[in-house]
Regions:
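Short aromatic-glycine-(Arg/Gly/Cys) micro-motifs in beta-strand/loop hairpins
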Residues: 8, 14-15, 19, 56-84
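Negatively charged, low-complexity tracts enriched in Asp/Glu with abundant Ser/Thr
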Residues: 1-55
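Short, Lys/Arg-enriched charge-dense amphipathic segments
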Residues: 49-60, 110-112
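Polar low-complexity intrinsically disordered regions enriched in Ser/Thr and small residues
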Residues: 27, 44, 60, 86-88
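Ampiphathic alpha-helical segments that act as solvent-exposed interaction surfaces
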Residues: 78-114
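Amphipathic alpha-helical interaction segments
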Residues: 21, 31, 60-61, 97
């Protein structure tokens, strides 16, 4: 299995810029590693780099699963995990914008606005 490349400075710039546009201020992000199954049939977990941030009680994570391959989810508690409905993105900007929109829609639905 090919090694998954680390998150690049340009990818971090995309995340930071998108979050600043969304929230109107700099959002602290963290780089970490996570172990996930890249394919549902995989028995072994693969280590992949992630970008994580927390905003207003919601946790966001973007997994880099390969060169120009990204997955994402947001969660409030371990048992409250949500995604965008797209398994994997080949464009980081589309991934993060879709993630932020899915969370905003979820929050609006929870408030009864949708």
């Amino acid at each position: 299995m090919p090694e998954i490349p680390d998150i690049t400075e340009s990818e971090l710039w995309i995340v930071d810029t998108t979050l600043k546009e969304r929230y109107g201020e700099k959002v602290e992000t963290q780089i970490a590693d996570a172990e996930i199954r890249l394919m549902p049939s995989d028995r072994d977990l693969s280590s992949c780099p992630v970008v994580y941030w927390n905003r207003e009680g919601c946790n966001f994570i973007i997994f880099k699963t390969g060169s120009r391959k990204y997955r994402c989810q947001f969660f409030y508690r371990g048992y409250q995990q949500y995604g965008t409905g797209v398994h994997e993105y080949d464009d980081l900007t589309e991934c993060i914008v879709s993630l932020l929109q899915a969370q905003a829609d979820h929050a609006a639905k929870e408030r009864g606005d949708l």
